[in-house]
């Protein structure tokens, strides 16, 4: 057997369905779109949920419950491992995190998360700390200050 004689296993490759190639193909003339109407046109069709002008089902059913998401506080998250860029003994404030690029946009404050390891003794000031973040900062000899 030579390289040019290699062929895929029979039945493993399916030919694309070619529309509009004669009536005998089964997909000729209208190409599976039926006769006339919005769906037969190029770019035709209606959006999902549209019922031809009839009040759609999702609007006929009552609303239920509420969502409190927009009232929740949005904290900028910074991991403990990211704080290793600062020098030993630095007081890490939210302004310092922003100027260093670790916290790009501070809305309701900064939350320090406990992912990774901290190797330097730092005093960290932030709005929120996770339990593991507090443990890791204090284990490195640093201090945690909730602002």
Swiss-Prot record:
NCBIfam families: rplO_bact (TIGR01071)
Gene3D superfamilies the UniProt entry points to: 3.100.10.10
Assembly information from the UniProt record: Part of the 50S ribosomal subunit.
Molecular function GO terms recorded: rRNA binding; structural constituent of ribosome
Keyword RNA-binding: yes
Native organism: Ruminiclostridium cellulolyticum (strain ATCC 35319 / DSM 5812 / JCM 6584 / H10) (Clostridium cellulolyticum)
Keyword flag Phosphoprotein: no
Protein family per UniProt: Belongs to the universal ribosomal protein uL15 family.
Region (Disordered): 1-54
The protein's name: Large ribosomal subunit protein uL15
UniProt function note: Binds to the 23S rRNA.
């Amino acid at each position: 057997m030579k390289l040019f004689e290699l062929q895929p296993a029979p039945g493993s490759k399916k030919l694309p369905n070619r529309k509009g190639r004669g009536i005998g193909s089964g997909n000729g003339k209208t190409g599976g779109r039926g006769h006339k109407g919005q769906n037969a046109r190029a770019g035709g069709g209606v959006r999902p949920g549209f019922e031809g002008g009839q009040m759609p089902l999702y609007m006929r059913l009552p609303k239920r419950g509420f969502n409190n998401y927009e009232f929740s506080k949005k904290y900028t998250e910074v991991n403990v491992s990211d704080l290793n860029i600062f020098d030993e003994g630095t007081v890490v404030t939210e302004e310092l995190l922003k100027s260093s690029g670790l916290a790009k946009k501070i809305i309701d404050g900064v939350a320090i998360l406990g992912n990774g390891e901290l190797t330097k003794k730092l005093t960290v000031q932030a709005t929120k700390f996770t339990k593991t973040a507090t443990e890791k900062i204090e284990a490195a000899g640093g201090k945690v200050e909730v602002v």
